[in-house]
């Protein structure tokens, strides 16, 4: 069974790797997932962590007197060093097997159609893979642009802020992969809300409006009978 560990603790957090980052002492939620990922959360930023370590990574504990240090190390030698001052809650739970996100019919069909006609994203675009799996879920499409750069594409029927946030999380994770980086983002939807477009533009994510009716009229190998 899949187990997740939730810890609420007064702690400081230091990231040591290609760069350094420090979070001063505060009460935070520490999330340890069965896939090996570790994330540090505050009571804001919605679901976006303050810092995290993607799998594979390993947790060890160093003695630190009154403040033990939990050290999370990934295969590249980067570390999250969590100095635990006080633990208020520590529990583990079995979540079972998750069925995964089920897209509605239109979104699923948009993904199929855009994968077949990826040139709608731009001249020279090629498809690498549909449902490109990451530690936090599948990216709808992973493509290459005309210059060979990696592009992550998130597809929605209605483009709202939560979709931009989802793509942002994928991009932050994918850009840690030295093989893929730098990875650009495209937010594609039938309709994109103004607030979502503004947020995407601010984060360097390109928005593409999809004409579903026109795309359905295109020649499709998947749905051809003869």
From Swiss-Prot:
EC number assigned by the record: 3.1.-.-
State the Gene3D superfamilies in the record.
2.70.180.20, 3.40.1350.10
Signal peptide coordinates: none
Q: Which cysteines are joined by disulfide bonds?
A: none
* A GO molecular function held by the record: single-stranded DNA endodeoxyribonuclease activity
Q: Which GO terms describe its cellular component?
A: cytoplasm
| Keyword Endoplasmic reticulum in annotation | no
Q: Which UniProt keywords apply?
A: Cytoplasm, DNA-binding, Endonuclease, Hydrolase, Nuclease
Q: What is its main location?
A: cytoplasm
For this protein, the record's Pfam families field holds: NucS_C, NucS_N
Cited InterPro entries: Endonuclease_NucS, NucS_C, NucS_N, NucS_N_sf, tRNA_endonuc-like_dom_sf
User: Would you say which domain of life the source belongs to?
Assistant: Bacteria
The record's listing under CDD domains reads: NucS-like (cd22341)
Q: Tell me which family the UniProt entry assigns to this protein.
A: Belongs to the NucS endonuclease family.
Role played: Cleaves both 3' and 5' ssDNA extremities of branched DNA structures.
This chain belongs to the protein called: Endonuclease NucS
Look up and give the organism this protein is from: Mycobacterium ulcerans (strain Agy99)
């Amino acid at each position: 069974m899949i187990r997740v560990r939730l810890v609420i603790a007064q702690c400081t957090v230091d990231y040591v790797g290609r760069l350094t980052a420090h979070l001063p002492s505060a009460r935070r939620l520490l999330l340890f997932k069965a896939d090996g990922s570790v994330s540090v959360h505050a009571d804001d930023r919605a679901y976006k962590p303050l810092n995290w370590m993607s799998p594979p990574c390993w947790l060890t504990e160093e003695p630190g007197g009154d403040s033990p240090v939990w050290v999370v190390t990934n295969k590249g030698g980067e570390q999250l060093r969590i100095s635990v001052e006080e633990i208020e809650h520590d529990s583990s739970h079995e979540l079972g097997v998750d069925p995964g996100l089920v897209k509605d019919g239109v979104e699923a069909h948009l993904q199929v159609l855009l994968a077949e006609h990826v040139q709608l994203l731009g001249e020279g675009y090629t498809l690498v893979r549909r449902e490109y799996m990451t530690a936090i879920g599948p990216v709808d499409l992973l493509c290459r642009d005309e210059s060979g750069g990696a592009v992550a594409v998130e597809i929605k029927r209605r483009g709202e802020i939560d979709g931009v946030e989802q793509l942002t999380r994928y991009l932050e994770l994918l850009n840690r992969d030295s093989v893929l980086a730098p990875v650009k983002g495209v937010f594609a939807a039938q309709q994109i809300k103004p607030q979502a477009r503004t947020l995407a533009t601010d984060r360097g994510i390109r928005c593409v409006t999809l004409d579903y009716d026109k795309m359905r009229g295109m020649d499709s190998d998947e749905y051809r009978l003869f």
